[in-house]
């Protein structure tokens, strides 16, 4: 009866429908109560066409439906896996799944007791989160409730693609949870790892790993491509990033320096030497007929500002041949080997333009003695000078290339660079004499409005030791002062003020000086002037001033002898007088203000006195106890290829004698200055009072005090 009832209810349910018999969706029932192992997931479908054959009119055939239901129940009872019957009426209507759940019989039962429970549950999608992106907590809850069928991990394990029991798909970003795999396994979730798919993070990682190396290689490729294909061609093509291997010399096919030998004054001998080089380039037959060879190099040597570079520009303007010019500091830069490479490139260009002139300014930057410095060794500068030596007079020679170089440090140059065959001539460009300074002043006064009272001969005599650059600066400063004072022309006052500005610095006109300090400075400077005026064979006083200039509170100007400056020869009496004059300021302070009120204003004077006295004993042989012996070396400089410090070549006893002799010379000079000031203290008072009133006294006004006071020269 139970089976007939079941068949009747089933026949009413299945009539006019497609019947699909299949295994139920896994995880619909988490813990089945039957011991069967589910292997097959086959589906059995009884199509609607079978029903239609027995019901031509399309009406439900009750007997046939009953047979279909009976067949389904029979298949369910004998199958090793539970079956599901799906009935679909219309395509738009939802499918109904009828699940047959097997139960373990406790006692023998009729045929249909195994499948007596027939139900059609539908998964509750409301228990699952909405959307395609789940939170990690939602994912764990769904796994524990059996709502997740399978998961697929990304390569890096940061993202999980899941499939729920209702075939919904979602993704979860998972943290580094070591218990996740165990949880999934305990709940029977299928686990797999993605091989072909990647997460968004993986995509960015791949893009980053590919793009940045490609950009780097692309940049290097363009760099070297540009270097090889830039103007000039080859590595280091002109204008390319590899240009550091090429010379940076300036080339002029037809030099237009705007300077000729007519613009060079005060260096007649140097001009003559270089004019011969220019004439050799213009008229080579004149010299080759006599077997003469053109000099390969001329080295211009002289103090800074004497016109070495100006002479080179004049040579370029007069020669009429291609001219290359560069500074020696341009050879050596950041990379190793650049200096030698640039030297080679420079001479390759010069040889292609021969005959030509190559001018290297400040050659001591690369031409210093090799092996210089502590421990010797090799450096980039040595490679550069070695290449320069080879190019100037090496195996291949440099026919037709004349090298001009300038330096103010010939003592540090390598001896191999100075030998004949490289620099055949060393042209000394010295400081100009009086006549030379007059010519230089005339050159630099072109284009300037000068007053009628300007006498270049007097200016030249007041500027002994000035170089051409100093005189140019003098005239320029005078023009600036005239413009500042809103004058139409430059007078002798502007030139005189500019001269003092150059020597001692600008005046501190706004400096507040107390009367006490002004009186102290006036007596200090009057002491220098008084001792200097009464010393025989000493330089005459040119000007005395107590106006602060630079770091000096006052100054006394002496006009040095032109002959003494040019020759460099100083007598013993002159040096002794110089020490006495330097000590005159301290002596005047002691005589007027007392020993307790002397100041530190004489500190520079003491340094000068000590230097002169020690040189007289150690270098000039002016000591009877030491004799005609030079004590001690000149000192070494480790960066000039010399020793770090000179080794003493005398005993401690000799050193004590030197110290005693130096002290004796200083004491003697101090006594002479004291005697002069105490003897002519009245003139000291007059000069100091005049300085307090006028602040500046020139030499002629100062000498008038001696005439009025009938002072006599003090000769010791």
Swiss-Prot record:
SUPFAM superfamilies: FtsH protease domain-like, P-loop containing nucleoside triphosphate hydrolases. Disruption phenotype: No visible changes in phenotype, probably due to a complementation by FTSH5. The presence of both FTSH1 or FTSH5 (subunit type A) and FTSH2 or FTSH8 (subunit type B) is essential for an active complex formation. Ubiquitous. In the N-terminal section; belongs to the AAA ATPase family. Binds 1 zinc ion per subunit. This is ATP-dependent zinc metalloprotease FTSH 1, chloroplastic. One of its GO terms (cellular component) is chloroplast thylakoid membrane. Induction: By high light. Its main location: plastid. Pfam families: AAA (PF00004), AAA_lid_3 (PF17862), Peptidase_M41 (PF01434). CDD domains: RecA-like_FtsH. InterPro entries: AAA+_ATPase, AAA_lid_3, ATPase_AAA_core, ATPase_AAA_CS, FtsH, P-loop_NTPase, Peptidase_M41, Peptidase_M41-like. It comes from the Eukaryota. NCBIfam families: FtsH_fam. It is found in: Plastid, Chloroplast thylakoid membrane. Keywords: ATP-binding, Chloroplast, Developmental protein, Hydrolase, Membrane, Metal-binding, Metalloprotease, Nucleotide-binding, Plastid, Protease, Thylakoid, Transit peptide, Transmembrane, Transmembrane helix, Ubl conjugation, Zinc. It is an enzyme of class 3 (hydrolase). Its cofactor is Zn(2+).
């Amino acid at each position: 009866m139970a089976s007939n009832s079941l068949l009747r209810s089933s026949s009413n349910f299945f009539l006019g429908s497609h019947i699909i018999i299949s295994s139920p969706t896994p995880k619909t029932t988490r813990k089945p109560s039957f011991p069967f192992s589910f292997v097959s997931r086959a589906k059995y479908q009884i199509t609607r066409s079978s029903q239609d054959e027995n019901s031509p009119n399309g009406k439900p055939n009750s007997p046939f439906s009953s047979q279909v239901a009976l067949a389904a129940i029979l298949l369910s009872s004998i199958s090793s896996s539970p079956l599901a019957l799906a009935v679909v009426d219309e395509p738009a209507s939802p499918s109904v799944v009828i699940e047959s759940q097997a139960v373990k019989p406790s006692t023998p039962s009729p045929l249909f007791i195994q499948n007596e429970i027939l139900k059609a549950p539908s998964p509750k999608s409301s228990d699952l989160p909405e959307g395609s992106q789940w939170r990690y907590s939602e994912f764990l809850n769904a796994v524990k409730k059996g709502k997740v069928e399978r998961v697929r991990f990304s390569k890096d394990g940061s993202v999980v693609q899941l499939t729920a029991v209702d075939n919904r798909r979602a993704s979860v970003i998972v943290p580094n949870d070591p218990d996740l795999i165990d949880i999934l396994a305990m709940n029977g979730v299928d686990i797999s790892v993605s091989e072909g798919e990647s997460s968004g993070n993986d995509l960015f990682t791949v893009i980053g790993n590919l793009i940045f190396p490609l950009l780097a290689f692309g940049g290097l490729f363009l760099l070297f491509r540009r270097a090889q294909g830039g103007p000039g061609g080859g590595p280091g093509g002109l204008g390319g990033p590899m240009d550091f291997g090429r010379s940076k010399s300036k080339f002029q096919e037809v030099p237009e320096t705007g300077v000729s030998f007519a613009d060079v004054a005060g260096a007649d001998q140097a001009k003559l030497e270089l004019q011969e080089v220019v004439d050799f380039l213009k008229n080579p037959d004149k010299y080759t007929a006599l077997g003469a060879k053109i000099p390969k190099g001329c080295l211009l040597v002289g103090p800074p500002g004497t016109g070495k570079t100006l002479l080179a520009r004049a040579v370029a303007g007069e020669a009429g041949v291609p001219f290359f010019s560069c500074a020696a500091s341009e050879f050596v830069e950041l990379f190793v080997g650049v200096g030698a490479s640039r030297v080679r490139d420079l001479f390759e260009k010069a040889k292609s333009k021969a005959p030509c002139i190559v001018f290297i300014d400040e050659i001591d930057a690369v031409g210093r003695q090799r092996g210089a410095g502590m421990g010797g060794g090799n450096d980039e500068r040595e490679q550069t000078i070695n290449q320069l030596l080879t190019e100037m007079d090496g195996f291949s020679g440099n026919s037709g290339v004349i090298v001009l170089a300038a330096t103010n440090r010939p003592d540090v140059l390598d001896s191999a660079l100075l030998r004949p065959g490289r620099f055949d001539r060393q042209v000394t460009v010295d400081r100009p004499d009086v006549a030379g300074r007059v010519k230089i002043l005339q050159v630099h006064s072109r284009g300037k409005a000068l007053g009628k009272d300007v006498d270049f001969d007097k200016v030249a005599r007041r500027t002994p030791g000035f170089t051409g650059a100093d005189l140019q600066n003098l005239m320029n400063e005078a023009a600036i002062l005239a413009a500042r004072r809103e004058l139409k022309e430059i007078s002798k006052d502007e030139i005189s003020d500019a001269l003092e500005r150059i020597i001692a610095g600008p005046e501190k006109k706004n400096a507040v000086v107390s009367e006490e300090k002004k009186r102290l400075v006036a007596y200090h400077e009057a002491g220098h002037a008084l001792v200097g005026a009464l010393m025989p064979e000493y330089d005459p006083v040119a000007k005395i001033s107590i106006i602060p200039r630079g770091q000096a509170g006052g100054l006394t100007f002496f006009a040095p002898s032109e002959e003494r400056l040019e020759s460099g020869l100083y007598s013993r009496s002159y040096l002794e007088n110089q020490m006495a004059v330097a000590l005159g300021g301290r002596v005047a302070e002691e005589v007027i203000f007392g020993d307790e009120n002397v100041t530190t204003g004489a500190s520079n004077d003491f340094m000068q006195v000590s230097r002169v006295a020690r040189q007289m004993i150690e270098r000039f042989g002016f000591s009877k106890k030491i004799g005609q012996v030079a004590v001690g070396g000149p000192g070494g400089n480790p960066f000039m290829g010399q020793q770090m410090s000179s080794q003493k070549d005398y005993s401690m006893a000799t050193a004590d004698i030197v110290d005693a002799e130096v002290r004796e010379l200083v004491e003697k000079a101090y006594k002479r200055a004291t005697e002069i000031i105490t003897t002519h203290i009245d003139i000291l008072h007059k000069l100091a009072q005049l300085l307090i009133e006028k602040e500046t006294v020139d030499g002629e006004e100062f000498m008038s005090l001696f005439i009025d006071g009938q002072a006599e020269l003090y000769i010791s």
